[in-house]
Amino acid sequence: MFMREIELRGHIIDSLILPKVFDKILDMGGDYKVLEFEIGKRKTDPSYAKILVIGRDERHVDEILNELRDLGAEIPEIEEVELQPAEKDMVLPEGFYSTTNHKTFIRFKGKWIEVENQKMDGAIVVYPDEMRAEVKTIRNIKKGDLVVVGHKGVRVIPPEKPREGGGLFEFMKSDASSEKPKETIIRRIAKEMYEIREKYRKTGKGGIVVVGGPAIIHTGAGWALAKLIRMGYVQALFAGNALATHDIESVLYGTSLGVDLKTGKSVPGGHSHHLRAINTIMRAGSIKDAVEQGILKEGVMYECIKNNIPYVLAGSIRDDGPLPDVITDVVKAQEKMRELLKGKDMVLMLSTMLHSIATGNLLPSWVKTICVDINPAVVTKLMDRGTSQALGIVTDVGVFLPMLVEELEKLEKEKEKSEKREE
């Protein structure tokens, strides 16, 4: 991707210059972003527009600019990014540029460089010899790192709604609501997930991360998440001590929080089942050891072990135990989450506000993000904290997951029938 700015001055609206410029850019396979637009108030007042022209590479952009010059476009000089060295470890220069989660480019030595490892609330560090830049968190800053300060030479490209709509993420571009048609939405999510899984199987790239809360187990939908993992629709699992603990409790005792998952009734002594489950895993050594010893024979964590799916169980101050697999150092947990999120195509957040917001803070805005919760305020909080690309589905996760599995099974059966007809 390559970009250049153009400027238009004069009666660019009355003379239809502005729409002609937009049409020409799109007709030549480029894209654009309006950076500034000032409309003249009176008939004699000129208008002004600054537009970012985006193309596949430098040659493509030059071809577009050559055509736009004929329409009156001016090519201004672009300011270079400003850099200052970090004075010591974990200390940023005054006035450092604080990143968003949107795709970002910097102008350095006459070239636009795409910033790597994009996330919100970080700083941009530039490596002149390698002609590259990346986002680093404040705790990873080292003395001497060249940090971007101010806004000069920085371009942010927010995700935009495609001009040709129709997909899931256009259909759902509105506030979270319990009144949206659940079956239609779940069907579209299943189609997206199926396509992502097929791409992952063919290329090893992309994939889906599930962020799960204990409500998955409490509502009796643990089997559905386990099946998603077994079917290949989960490439990483993020959760806390609670989901894993209650998943193991449900396997060993048939309860979650002491409530029988078949009858919905509390069982005698059930209040201690989660502690006994933790104790069993402690005795075994780890969740993996419990699977290998035949103690755990099914469930979400069992499927993660059997299918080599990496998971991050991030600790909390309120945890019982916790399980030996839980990462109690939040910095280490966050680093592992960030590593597993790299290159993923979708994140499915299921009934966990804490872990959903934590994951959202690590995500670039172009990753498809779906948040399922019975409380609409959870989606609102997620978006308020910067994850504006999140699409909210207000429903019980215990209903959502089984329906999702059902839709995915239908898609797989349709594929099998199609392949047999071709034979």
From Swiss-Prot:
It catalyses: L-ornithine = L-proline + NH4(+). The keyword Lyase applies. The keyword rRNA-binding does not apply. It is an enzyme of class 4 (lyase). Its cofactor is NAD(+). NAD(+) binds at N241, A242, D320, T352, M353, L354, H355, D373, D396, V397. Its EC number is 4.3.1.12. Keywords: Lyase, NAD, Nucleotide-binding. It comes from the Archaea. NCBIfam families: TIGR00300 family protein. Catalyzes the conversion of ornithine to proline, with the release of ammonia. Belongs to the AgrE/ArgZ ornithine cyclodeaminase family. This is Ornithine cyclodeaminase. It comes from Methanocaldococcus jannaschii (strain ATCC 43067 / DSM 2661 / JAL-1 / JCM 10045 / NBRC 100440) (Methanococcus jannaschii). The lineage of its organism: Archaea, Methanobacteriati, Methanobacteriota, Methanomada group, Methanococci.
